Every structure is written in structure tokens, then in C-alpha cells.
Swiss-Prot record:
GO CC terms in record: cytoplasm
Keyword Zinc: no
Organism from which the protein derives: Thermoanaerobacter pseudethanolicus (strain ATCC 33223 / 39E)
Residue span, PPIase FKBP-type domain: 163-248
GO BP annotation list: 'de novo' cotranslational protein folding; cell division; chaperone-mediated protein folding; protein transport; protein unfolding
Gene Ontology molecular function: peptidyl-prolyl cis-trans isomerase activity; protein folding chaperone; ribosome binding
Enzyme class: isomerase
Name the UniProt record assigns to this protein: Trigger factor
């Protein structure tokens, strides 16, 4: 058997395979035995005609397809091994020569894993990013704590105001008919929170407890229930009760109630410390992102289109998955935005290309720098994931397939390599 690499351009390989005539004859015999029962030749019972008669009656080419398939796989695998190629899709096969008693010559064209030519990835200059924590940030967090620890007390002697918590019964009607999901009792709604249908909360303000009234709304065009989008509805609403939040005083007693600290100043100091750490991590992640962008820009790699198309497929599946949490799906999203699937795929192309290139470059650096995942790192990641899923660690491990474990290890290696790149960066202060 002979193999030759005719060309390798833009990560698409064209390989010529020469299969000896005797090997192809073996394939023809295999094809005949496989299909013998299908041949119906006059003068012979079905499946009993000799091969020479079958070829004369149907034509010599009747066995070619299965014969080529029989001999191709072995020759193709040998060629990939010889030229150290890793295919990323199925090959297109072109027959250059075929015939009884002749060597079979095939041409296989296949996109392969691209070779990455790394540029500079050590000593990358990155401008330092810092986020300060201001007094207002601390006060904002304190106010959130107050809201979380507020007492709910009844409102008496006045109509509803913004900020009140209204307890309502309601039933919605479209064209005078009730609709599914449009009815509730003892529903708590904070007025002014903008968490309900637009315009609904505003029309409760000014009404008194035990009052029944109409609320007129129009459902938004992007409403989660497709059947209700853009439709006008009338809700019969009864205001059953009004409550409000009574916020605790910001003092040492408050600090003792909501934390392990004895004084408000200690609580403030802890909040500031946590915000500073949060900002440090956020700033570091942004610098890492900028470093990776520069490293990827410095690298050269010809990426086959099929790898980008597959990344777009993944992005579309993720988009559809997230849309379903909002009561939508990909088709309804396309309808709302007025886009076609083809247009959306085109919009996603550049982002998908960058994601594929980034992954390839990071993988190459990991290989060059011998960055590997230790058993301890894998164990720690599995512990973290099990804790997040609130499942026993051993049970979680047993639930994972080998493919899933490999995927987790790849993620660890990916971020470990990014940490390596960042550790080699030169951080430049803005003043420099």
C-alpha cells in the first residue's frame, strides 16, 4: 500500500492512497459475499449466480462501493498515522483509478487539527487594573442587609404607596375571557419593584384595602408566554391588605443581630474587606482576559471552517437552553428579533472563531510548558462541584463518565494555563 500527502493547506489535508490490486480484489470478494442474496440473475436462483456472471449482468461497478469501503478504512488510518494527522471531520473521497486487476487509487480530503504557531506569550505587558472601594459601596451593602432583615408591618389608614407590599387577588381577562395563568389569590407584590407586568403595579397605588378595581395592561412583545405577547388584558383586582417594611436602625445591636461582630464599625470593616477582595479578583480576571487576548493575537493558526461551525452549534444549543428558562426557545427568539438562523450563524462566526483559536492556543501553551492536572487538583475540583450540587462526593464521582472526567480535567488545565500566562505578564501601572 502506498500513501502520499499531496497538500496541506489551511488545515485541510489531501492524501493519496494506493491500494494494491490484490487487496482490492479481496474487497471485491467481500462485497460480493455481502450482497450475493440481492442479485437476481436469469437462469440462477436468487443469490446463487457466480460473481463473474453477476459482474457481467449488472456491470463490474456493482461491487465497487462496498469494496472501496472495505479497503479504505485500514489505508486511511495508516496514512493518518504516517503523517501524524488528527482529523476533525469525515473525509471526502475521490476515486482516481478503479478497475478489476488494477491498483485502486483514492484521494481523501479531510480537515485536520491545525498546527498552532505561537507568538510571544511570556512577558506580555498588561496595564494594571484596580477598583477602589468607596464609602458609598459599603453603605449600599449595609442597606441591603437592612432590607433583608426588615420587619413586615401592616399599613393602616392610608391608600397604597410605592414601596408598600400589596396582598391582592386578581383575575385577568382578554376579550372578556379568562386566560390560563391569569388568576391568583393572596399574591404579594412590592409596589414600585417593577417585577410584575409593566404598568400593573402603578395602577394599584392610590387604592385602599378591600377595594376592587380594574387594571388595564398590554403584555410586552417579549413576554415569556408566547400566546399573550402584545395582547391587551383587563385584571379584576382586590386589594386585601397592605404591608410595609420596617427597617432596623444601623447601630451596634444591628451588627450583633446580622453578623458575628460586636460593633457596627467592625461590620463595616468586614464588608469593606470583602468588597476589596471581590474587586481584586474582578480586576485580576479582567487583566487575565486582556493577556489571553494578546497571546491569541500573537499566535498564527489556520482553523478549518468545520471547527467554527461546530462551535456555533454549541453556542446555539446554549442559547436555546437559556431561552427556555425565560419561556422562549430559539425559534421564538428568531421570530421576535426578525432574524433567520442563517443570519444568526453569520453573526456568531467571529466570536466562535475566536473561541476556537483561544482554545487551540491555550492547549498548545499547556503542551509546550508541560502543564498537567494533578490528582489533587482534580480531587479538589470534584469536591467543589459536589458541594455546589449538594451531593455526596463519592456518589458524584460514581455518576461521572470517563468523558465527563476528561472534560473536567481539560477545564482545570485551561485555567491553570491562563494562570501561568498571567504569572509571566509584566503589569504596567498607569503612571508608568
Amino acid at each position: 500500500m502506498g500513501v502520499s500527502l499531496k497538500k496541506l493547506e489551511k488545515s485541510v489535508a489531501t492524501i493519496e492512497l494506493t491500494i494494491p490490486s490484490e487487496k482490492f480484489e479481496e474487497g471485491l470478494n467481500f462485497a460480493f459475499k455481502k450482497n450475493a442474496s440481492k442479485f437476481n440473475v436469469p437462469g440462477f436462483r436468487r443469490g446463487k449466480a457466480p460473481r463473474v456472471i453477476v459482474e457481467r449482468y449488472y456491470g463490474e461497478g456493482v461491487l465497487y462501493e462496498d469494496a472501496v469501503e472495505y479497503v479504505f478504512d485500514e489505508a486511511y488510518k495508516e496514512a493518518l498515522k504516517t503523517f501524524n494527522l488528527e482529523p476533525v471531520d469525515y473525509p471526502d473521497i475521490n476515486i482516481l483509478q478503479i478497475g478489476k486487476g488494477k491498483d485502486l487509487i483514492l484521494e481523501a480530503t479531510v480537515p485536520v487539527m491545525p498546527e498552532v504557531e505561537l507568538g510571544e506569550y511570556k512577558g506580555i505587558e498588561i496595564e494594571k487594573i484596580e477598583y477602589n472601594v468607596y464609602d458609598g459601596d459599603v453603605e449600599y451593602e449595609l442597606e441591603k442587609l437592612r432590607q433583608q432583615n426588615a420587619r413586615i408591618v401592616p399599613v393602616e389608614g392610608r391608600p397604597a404607596e410605592s414601596g408598600d407590599i400589596a396582598v391582592i387577588d386578581f383575575e385577568g381577562f382578554i376579550d372578556g375571557k379568562p386566560f390560563e395563568g391569569g388568576k391568583a389569590e393572596n399574591y404579594e407584590l412590592e409596589l414600585g419593584s417593577n417585577t410584575f407586568i409593566p404598568g400593573f403595579e402603578d395602577q394599584i397605588i392610590g387604592h385602599n384595602v378591600n377595594e376592587t378595581f380594574d387594571v388595564n395592561i398590554t403584555f410586552p412583545e417579549d413576554y415569556r408566554v408566547e400566546e399573550l405577547r402584545g395582547k391587551s388584558a383587563v385584571f379584576k383586582v382586590t386589594l386585601k391588605a397592605l404591608n410595609k417594611k420596617e427597617l432596623p436602625e444601623l447601630d451596634d445591636e444591628f451588627a450583633k443581630d446580622v453578623s458575628e461582630f460586636e460593633t457596627l464599625d467592625e461590620l463595616k470593616a468586614d464588608i469593606r474587606k470583602k468588597l476589596e477582595e471581590k474587586n481584586r479578583v474582578e480586576a485580576e480576571n479582567e487583566m487575565k482576559e486582556k493577556a489571553v487576548m494578546k497571546v491569541v493575537e500573537n499566535a498564527k493558526v489556520d482553523i478549518p471552517d468545520v471547527m467554527v461551525e461546530r462551535q456555533i452549534d454549541i453556542s446555539l444549543r446554549d442559547l436555546d437552553y437559556n431561552l427556555r428558562y425565560q419561556g422562549l426557545d430559539l425559534n421564538s427568539y428568531l421570530s421576535i428579533t426578525g432574524k433567520t438562523l442563517e443570519n444568526l450563524r453569520k453573526e456568531m462566526w467571529d466570536g466562535a472563531l475566536n473561541r476556537v483559536k483561544t482554545q487551540l492556543v491555550i492547549d498548545k501553551i499547556a503542551k509546550v510548558e508541560n502543564i498537567e492536572v494533578t490528582e489533587e487538583e482534580l480531587e479538589n475540583k470534584l469536591k467543589e462541584m459536589a458541594a455546589n450540587y449538594r451531593i455526596n462526593l463519592e456518589e458524584f464521582k460514581k455518576s461521572l463518565t470517563e468523558s465527563q472526567i476528561n472534560s473536567i480535567k481539560e477545564d482545570i488545565a485551561y485555567y491553570k494555563t491562563i494562570d501561568f500566562i498571567f504569572s509571566k505578564c509584566k503589569i504596567i501601572s498607569k503612571e508608568e
